[in-house]
Amino acid sequence: MKAAVIVFPGSNCDRDCKVAIERSAGARVEMVWHQETALPDDLDLIVLPGGFSYGDYLRCGAMAAQSPVMKEVVSAAGKGVAVVGICNGFQVLTEVGLLPGALLRNAGLKYVCKPVELDIVNGQTRFTAGYGEQRQAVMTVGNGEGNYFADEETLDRLEGEGQVVFRYKENPNGSARDIAGIVNKGGNVLGLMPHPDRAFDADLGSEDGAVLFRSIFQSA
């Protein structure tokens, strides 16, 4: 089992993701700098971590989406490799076109950092199958631009095709239809604002993030 964590200038959750994956799933994790033009071979998972890539200049995730390594990430996603974008990583996935919609400033115009309760809307994805009968999860958000937006037609399609994976029980940022995480149509690309990398050990207040990481490798 093998994963890669992409590191951009300004990433600050890359090491969190590495430790979370190693401890949750026992996978080998390689850190990949944004200027690389090739990914490690035989990857089961690629993670775009949280943080403030390129200082959030221009627009959150916009500059990271133009990094050389992202061409390889898009190519790997097209071949079915699992890709997870967490927080800033979710923003990058929308900027590069792997997921629809955009992440806007929080409705309250403030940075929000706190544990949130999530409904597991679709438990049949490769990211959520490990939750079994569990229908709620607790993870932590930490963002100023976590307000998911898409037009009504796109939102209807996401809901109708089972692409909404996580939904906030109490919306912290104004996200359309309380959406916290979505997958692409192929089911192998997940973007979510809550941090599974901050919920992989009981000492952190929740182990629900560990379930997500294990699910990925169990389905690989």
UniProtKB/Swiss-Prot annotation:
<dbReference type="GO" id="GO:0004359">
    <property type="term" value="F:glutaminase activity"/>
</dbReference>
<keyword id="KW-0963">Cytoplasm</keyword>
<protein>
    <recommendedName>
        <fullName>Phosphoribosylformylglycinamidine synthase subunit PurQ</fullName>
        <ecNumber>6.3.5.3</ecNumber>
        <ecNumber>3.5.1.2</ecNumber>
    </recommendedName>
</protein>
<keyword id="KW-0315">Glutamine amidotransferase</keyword>
<dbReference type="GO" id="GO:0004642">
    <property type="term" value="F:phosphoribosylformylglycinamidine synthase activity"/>
</dbReference>
<keyword id="KW-0436">Ligase</keyword>
<dbReference type="InterPro" id="IPR029062">
    <property type="entry name" value="Class_I_gatase-like"/>
</dbReference>
<comment type="function">
    <text>Part of the phosphoribosylformylglycinamidine synthase complex involved in the purines biosynthetic pathway. Catalyzes the ATP-dependent conversion of formylglycinamide ribonucleotide (FGAR) and glutamine to yield formylglycinamidine ribonucleotide (FGAM) and glutamate. The FGAM synthase complex is composed of three subunits. PurQ produces an ammonia molecule by converting glutamine to glutamate. PurL transfers the ammonia molecule to FGAR to form FGAM in an ATP-dependent manner.</text>
</comment>
<comment type="subunit">
    <text>Part of the FGAM synthase complex composed of 1 PurL, 1 PurQ and 2 PurS subunits.</text>
</comment>
<dbReference type="GO" id="GO:0005737">
    <property type="term" value="C:cytoplasm"/>
</dbReference>
<keyword id="KW-0378">Hydrolase</keyword>
<keyword id="KW-0067">ATP-binding</keyword>
<dbReference type="GO" id="GO:0006189">
    <property type="term" value="P:'de novo' IMP biosynthetic process"/>
</dbReference>
<feature type="active site">
    <location>
        <position position="195"/>
    </location>
</feature>
<keyword id="KW-0547">Nucleotide-binding</keyword>
<keyword id="KW-0658">Purine biosynthesis</keyword>
<dbReference type="InterPro" id="IPR010075">
    <property type="entry name" value="PRibForGlyAmidine_synth_PurQ"/>
</dbReference>
<dbReference type="Pfam" id="PF13507">
    <property type="entry name" value="GATase_5"/>
</dbReference>
<comment type="pathway">
    <text>Purine metabolism; IMP biosynthesis via de novo pathway; 5-amino-1-(5-phospho-D-ribosyl)imidazole from N(2)-formyl-N(1)-(5-phospho-D-ribosyl)glycinamide: step 1/2.</text>
</comment>
<dbReference type="GO" id="GO:0005524">
    <property type="term" value="F:ATP binding"/>
</dbReference>
<feature type="active site" description="Nucleophile">
    <location>
        <position position="87"/>
    </location>
</feature>
<feature type="domain" description="Glutamine amidotransferase type-1">
    <location>
        <begin position="3"/>
        <end position="220"/>
    </location>
</feature>
